[in-house]
Regions:
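Conserved phosphate-binding loops in N-terminal lobes of ATP-dependent enzymes
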Residues: 11-100, 223-227, 231
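Phosphate/pyrophosphate-binding loops at sites that engage ATP/ADP/AMP, CoA/4′-phosphopantetheine
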Residues: 84-97, 196-205, 257-270
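Helical "lid/coupling" subdomains associated with nucleotide-phosphate turnover
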Residues: 221-334
Length: 335
């Protein structure tokens, strides 16, 4: 039976099939009287109609009552159920699945996720630690490594022990260091640029604020490659245009990225999750870190599926995988 991987991160949930196809959905749901919107459609309303937006249901997966939730939505677990149900409807049918989960997911969250999956008639064959999966196929210089997993609301710093296997050792959650925090910094910086250059404040109008929110990642990614870019936002039929400079973006984000460096050890390899890839290299270089490939963890887990399948009706959390580069090196040496 084929296995589908489901990678849980509130930036985006990813489905990865054995044929290498990847399907993604931002970890956002928008609820209103007309029903539910998911993923990109929900994200497109987060700033223009924020009251109905939910983006913490994966990072805070629990059964704490949601205030003013619509009928049938009691808590974050209900919203996560609907999001997974939507993904299955779009890209299913799914039967046998393996979940790749953040290192800071508690037993309570894993238990809830298992219950949600079983309610959706999914056969869960196991859970795999995301940090372990990302480092298992990397060439590393030290016996200790740290993996920074960027989420919407936090960055999880995992410490791993490296020998013939990659083993999870511990994790630390850095609050106010997630993609939303970086995004708020970027949005405020760009808004200041519009005020200075075009005498236009995009944050004073819900529609233009939503435009800015939608465009920010693309503009940051462009500045990763270019020293300057020209951008524009439209309001009431008028286009406001300005120039953005990479040096100024780096200056705006440097304090936030400096805070990420605080828990990092000098004697450890540091690897960043692929969600950091949109930011300028100068910011990443300050962390003395390397980027993980976009599908590195998923490819690694898929290659290890026989080892990861749970038996005897016990669904296990795997926090240790063979270090592929170590194994390859030993094979090349004939041992």
């Amino acid at each position: 039976m084929s296995v589908t991987l489901i990678d849980i991160n509130d930036v985006e949930v990813r489905l990865y099939r054995e044929d290498g196809k990847v399907f993604t959905s931002p970890g956002v749901v928008h609820l209103d009287s007309d029903g539910m919107l998911f993923g990109a459609d929900a994200r497109a309303r987060l700033r223009s109609n924020p009251q109905g937006g939910f983006d913490k249901f994966w990072s805070q997966l629990d059964e704490v009552p949601v205030a003013a939730g619509p009928r049938g939505i009691r808590h974050h677990a209900d919203i996560a159920y609907r999001h997974l149900q939507h993904l299955i409807g779009e890209h299913g049918p799914l039967k046998q699945v393996l979940f790749v989960v953040p290192s800071d997911y508690s037993r309570a969250k894993l238990s809830l996720l298992l219950g949600i999956a079983q309610a959706l008639q999914l056969e869960v064959t196991g859970f795999v630690d995301n940090a372990v999966a990302n480092l298992a196929c990397r060439t590393l210089q030290h016996q200790t490594a740290q993996f920074l997993d960027l989420g919407l609301h936090r960055t999880c710093v995992s410490r791993l022990e490296i020998n013939e296997r990659v083993r999870f050792a511990s994790s630390q959650t850095l609050e106010r260091s997630g993609k939303n925090h970086f995004g708020d910094i970027v949005i405020n910086w760009i808004a200041d640029c519009f005020l200075d250059q075009a005498r236009f404040d995009p944050l004073q109008d819900a529609a233009s604020e939503q435009q800015l929110f939608d465009q920010q990642d693309g503009w940051v990614n462009q500045l990763r490659k270019s020293a300057h870019i020209n951008v524009g936002l439209e309001q009431h039929g008028r286009l406001h245009e300005i120039s953005l400079a990479r040096d100024e973006l780096i200056r705006a984000l440097t304090p936030a990225f400096t805070a990420l460096a605080a828990p990092l050890a000098a004697s450890a390899d540091v690897v960043l999750s692929h969600h950091f890839a949109i930011y300028p290299q100068e910011l990443l270089s300050n962390l003395n870190a390397k980027l993980a490939g976009k599908t590195t963890a998923l490819e690694t887990v898929m290659a290890c599926v026989p080892e990861l399948l749970s038996t005897a009706n016990e669904v296990r959390l795997c926090r240790s995988l063979p270090h592929a580069t170590m194994t390859a090196g030993r094979n090349e040496n004939g041992s």
